[in-house]
């Protein structure tokens, strides 16, 4: 992940005044956003040093001479969004497939028209894209994510199915971590499918004997992910792949129950995985097990919308049973969504979240899904990743949908974007 200049952050002091609302996320439950009204917030370097009333913050800050000040009067402050499930590194576009499917989703129609579809279409386009071009196109997407409020993003491989192609995708994450003012958490998703013309058994051997050891040896990923579903990997196969990852120091996560329940979430609970994503067909009986195992449930409203899912994920019973929940864009060629603000709106309209629960899932929950306890909450000594939203109340982001409500993005104590623009030279 990107590391800011230490000397610069030590010298920086920032006081944000007069916010109508500060959502600290210091609460204990899914619906508690830790609201502070008429709030102030003080930052030293890259860390928050005080949050609360004017009197509390000024007392904690001490001498304020020379401190940079931002007036947030009538505005809302929240933690930066943590987009904890994306496939943002990819080549090409599947717009032709998407456009046809809007009115005629039959596979035979797409085949007759000669339109490549699905993951394997993206695999071929990504393989054919140079690392430089792949980085440039991904950077454009990540910049859009940053100005709409995402300060930490998880980014998966999974459109390669060979070691060089998967490593190329992970190298893009490394390159962009050095140039963008956001943290990129890399995930190895070699088990997104398997190489065409090869058996699944052969490919699993390649994953465990060559690909995972190499990814780990070169420190290219923090997480190891598998897509478990009918027609893809079984729970037993996923257990082997994820256990191999654990043996090489990679944290397990899983694509679970998107189109069927074949034991993926039960495995997530058994292995105490960091997170499980999709959850469209997760049985009620497994939800308490996920909660007790500390598995964060990741709901992907954009995907449910983009594919017109026949069984939209219902987060309500998960929230009610006390699972920690997260929201993410799942940005990918089949769900090209870059804004977490749109995710918030969809989550509340179609997936059973209240506005408070959605904001908490998009910040605190996303950080927990990535095992990051230093962000997603505005509290003393936490990383100063936060947003100033040009709204009177946080619910307005969900209510007044369709535009960017982020006025200011602060990353590690530094203003990095304002009014839809990153405060540095734009890419050529």
Regions found by a protein language model. Give the residues of each.
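N-terminal metal-binding scaffold of metallo-dependent hydrolase/deaminase domains
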Residues: 1-60, 396
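Conserved beta-strand scaffold positions in the cores of enzyme catalytic domains, especially
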Residues: 15, 66-71, 186, 409
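Divalent metal-coordination and catalytic microenvironments
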Residues: 19, 41, 46, 74, ...
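Metal-associated gating/positioning segment near the N- to mid-region
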Residues: 69-137
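Non-catalytic positions within long, well-ordered alpha-helices that form the structural scaffold/packing
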Residues: 146, 208, 216-217, 246, ...
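Active-site-adjacent C-terminal substructures of enzyme catalytic domains
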Residues: 251-252, 261-377, 389-391, 395, ...
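Short peripheral tails and domain-boundary helices/loops at the edges of structured domains
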Residues: 406-422
């Amino acid at each position: 992940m990107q590391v800011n200049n230490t000397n610069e952050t030590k010298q920086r002091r920032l006081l944000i005044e007069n916010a109508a609302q500060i959502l600290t996320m210091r609460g204990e439950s899914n619906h508690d956003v830790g609201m502070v009204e008429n709030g102030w917030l003080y930052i030293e370097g890259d860390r928050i040093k005080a949050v609360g009333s004017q009197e509390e913050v000024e007392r904690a800050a001490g001498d304020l001479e020379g401190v940079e000040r931002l007036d947030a009067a009538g505005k809302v402050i929240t933690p930066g969004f943590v987009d904890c499930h994306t496939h943002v590194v990819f080549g090409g576009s599947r717009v032709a497939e998407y456009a046809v499917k809007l009115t005629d989703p039959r596979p035979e129609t797409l085949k007759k028209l000669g339109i490549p579809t699905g993951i394997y279409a993206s695999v071929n386009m990504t393989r054919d894209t140079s690392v430089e071009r792949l980085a440039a196109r991904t950077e454009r997407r990540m910049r859009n994510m940053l100005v709409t409020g995402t300060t930490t993003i998880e980014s998966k491989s999974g459109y390669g199915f060979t070691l060089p192609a998967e490593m190329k995708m992970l190298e893009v994450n490394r390159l962009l971590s050095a140039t963008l003012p956001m943290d990129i958490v890399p995930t190895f998703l070699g088990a997104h499918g398997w190489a065409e013309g090869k058996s699944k058994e052969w490919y699993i051997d390649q994953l465990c004997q060559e690909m995972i050891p190499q990814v780990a040896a070169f420190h290219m990923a923090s997480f190891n992910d598998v897509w478990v579903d009918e027609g893809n990997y079984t729970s037993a196969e996923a257990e082997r792949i994820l256990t191999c990852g654990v043996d090489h120091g990679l944290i397990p996560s899983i694509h679970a129950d998107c189109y069927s329940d074949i034991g993926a979430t039960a495995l997530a609970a058994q292995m105490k995985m960091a997170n499980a994503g999709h959850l469209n067909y997760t049985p009620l009986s497994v939800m308490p097990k996920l909660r007790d195992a500390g598995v964060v449930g990741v709901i992907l409203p954009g995907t449910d919308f983009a594919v017109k899912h026949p069984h939209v994920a219902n987060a309500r019973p998960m929230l009610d049973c006390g699972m920690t929940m997260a929201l993410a864009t799942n940005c990918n060629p089949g769900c090209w969504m870059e804004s977490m603000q749109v995710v918030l709106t969809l989550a509340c309209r179609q997936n059973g979240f209240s506005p408070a629960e959605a904001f908490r899932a998009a910040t605190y929950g996303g950080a927990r899904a990535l095992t990051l306890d230093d962000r997603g909450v505005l509290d003393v000594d936490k990383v100063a990743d936060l947003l100033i939203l040009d709204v009177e109340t946080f619910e307005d982001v969900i209510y007044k949908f369709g535009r960017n409500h982020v006025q200011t993005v602060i990353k590690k104590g530094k203003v990095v974007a304002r009014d839809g623009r990153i405060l540095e030279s734009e890419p050529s």
